Amino acid sequence: TECMVGTRRKLGYDGMCAGAYGGISAMMGGHLPNSEGKIVGDGDDVVHSREDIEKLRPYDPKKCPMLKNLLKTIELMRKEEPDEPIYVILHVPAAVAFTLMGAKPAFKAMVKNPELFRALSDHVEDAVVESSKILWDAGVDFLWFPMPNFGGYCISRKTYEKCISESNIRANKRIKDYGANIVIHTCGPYD
């Protein structure tokens, strides 16, 4: 927090990013082995079938250490800079699914098994919406959703429409209906 506030003051820019929240994949899939058979704890590269989706743990924000840390950061930032906008970067359901599948398997699923990718996105949607509500209630000024960019790689409009669009529209509507301000950071002509 001191670093963010100090840097903002020194450079004079507006707004502070409290962080990028990646706790959903870790909480739901961190107990599962990745494609190398290792349990790393971050939930990356652990879902490769419908059976793996069933092995995911339910999302419990009260038990998520990453969310607790982010909420504390928001509280400290608000105390230090009460009038400065604070935002959090979050993943849309498809981005959480992408993490849970791992990059190579996710791209492959989007082309060869889009039903699996959509099923996983649907499975994590409630967790994304719930996290967004908690962060909004914590006092952030807006939520930032980068999409449809995955780890710096853009995807085609066709793949976006086939695998991701419906989930994004639905989740974003639920979050906006709650009253949250969101920024959708698009990549390419997807508006």
Residue ranges with predicted function:
Residues 1, 25-38:
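Glycine-rich loop at the start of a catalytic domain that most often binds anionic cofactors/ligands
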Residues 49-56:
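Acidic/polar active-site rim loop that often engages polyanionic ligands
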Residues 10:
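Catalytic cores of phosphodiester-bond-cleaving enzymes
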Residues 1-3, 14, 18, 38-45, ...:
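Active-site loop segments of alpha/beta catalytic cores
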